[in-house]
Amino acid sequence: MKFIKRCFLAALALALVSSCELTELDLQDNPNRVSPENANVDDLYNAIQLNVQDLIEDAWYATGSMARMVANINSYNYSNAFTPEALNDLWNEAYAQIFPDVDALVALAEPRGQDIHAGTAKILRAYVMMILVDMFGDVPNSEALQGTDIISPAADPGSVVYADAIALLDEAIAQLSGTDAVAPSYDNFYGGDAAKWVTLAKTLKLRAYVTTRLVDSNAPSEVAALLAEGDLIDEASEDFQFNYGSNRLVPDSRHPLYDNHYEAGDGDYVGNYFMWLLRAEKLDANGNPVVDPRVRYYFYRQVESSVDGSINDYSCHFSNFPTQEDQPAHYADIDPRLPYCVAASDGYWGRDHLNAEGIPPDGNLRSRYGLYPAAGQFDDNSFQTTQRLGTTGGGGAGIEPLMLSSFVDFLRAEAALTMGTGEDARALLESGIRKSMAKVISFGDLVPNTFAREVDIRGEIATVEELYKPTDKDIDDYVALVISNYDATDDQLDVVMKAYLIALWGNGIEAYNMYRRTGKPNNMAPALEPNNEDFVSTFFLPAEHVNLNQNVTQKAHTVRVFWAEGGPDVY
């Protein structure tokens, strides 16, 4: 169904953001815009929310792989890591669906006083506008959506699009504040609660100003004003997340990452570096690895050992087997403990960054997306294959974590360290970790039978919950270690951003932004091959846009987004 829809969207997009032989057609209206007289506001509203979810899904592999959450296996170098065709769908979701539908909805809703519909749709539009800039740099905005009046819209500078998005957020805040308008019949994000949408809009402004802090001298004062007002996402009930269902067919309402790993296909490789961050990166005072309490929720291991496979099970590149002694020298230059070929020996089976070796028959060996956020399986040491036609775990009834209260704490901690806001970065670091832990652990409610299952451990019977659910002490000990690391280093931003990256699991966009903005973590795993080309600072413009718009030429992947100019060099 999504394929069919996207084929239709691609055709619609041609007249919207592209140049083609249509000038002789006497079309007075934008052919992509739904006319108000033929539109139902609740139907449009639902379509906008679903298409925002689709856009985020389309961004996952690109952004998540650059943040090392998933392994990019397309190439050994950055210039070929993505083709211009790779993000056509995302572009069409924005320009052929979300933006025209928002315009149509606003035109229909505002004369009727449906301010919650209109204001919240504007917030989603502003959010998508910023994402497009984050991923591509300069994009059409002021000349877009003009139909045949402007069939080859020029790009606006990213800074201008960001400013327009912030202005749209302010417009939405004013429209929603104190309104008693009727709520949408269905709102996946906030159930029609206008106050929570206002909180989101202000939080997205915080996101914008922290993101642009390297280039905007006004950002510190804007952040200070938002902090003083105090209306930011700071508790789980305000989390900005898309909520999935568990329906498998017609329509499939499950989390896309559940479909990726729990049907019949092999799916993505989880990034070795990211799994290692949770499984083995941190050490206690005796040099022993400290395991992150979230690890069993984030990943499901299909095998007990990731180093006992046959030669045909691996594609390590520099060796036949995943022996740490064969770790390439440029890994050791960054961190001698960086994992090579697998994340850890006890079943954490992923793939290294930019490893384009062939794909071995390892579908039943790879580590899987776990219970959080995709509602897959909790890792209960059962070591079973997950390719069971979507019948296991939480059934895909997970979330798309877009802007959680934990994320906001980390953004505020970053702002405290880099913008002098006066807030306590150390306290915000701890708060962010604890909120993330609570959110993740709550997903155990999706699999009560798993946690109630009894296990015989050396003659002793215990439940999975008793054996593997993190205790308060587990959480306290982990938090204490991170805080100790924070206190012991001169690079406190590195500790905060590493904790932020871990909490961001499932959100590649914010992780990609954070890495380009801060250059953290300092020990980010490099590309598998040494002397790699420059990082993907922004993605290639989508092929459909470039090929069909006379005002566009393809750009290099090394062109930085405006807010990263003068920022750290990343690899």
In which residue ranges do the predicted regions lie?
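Bacterial N-terminal signal peptides that target proteins for export
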Residues: 1-8
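Short, compositionally biased low-complexity segments
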Residues: 20-27, 70-78, 134-143, 459-474
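Membrane-proximal, proline-rich intrinsically disordered regions
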Residues: 20-68, 74-77, 85, 89, ...
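Structured, solvent-exposed acidic/aromatic patches
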Residues: 39, 70-444, 489-491
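Short coil/turn segments at secondary-structure boundaries
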Residues: 60-64, 299-301, 508-517
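C-terminal functional modules
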Residues: 409, 417, 436-571
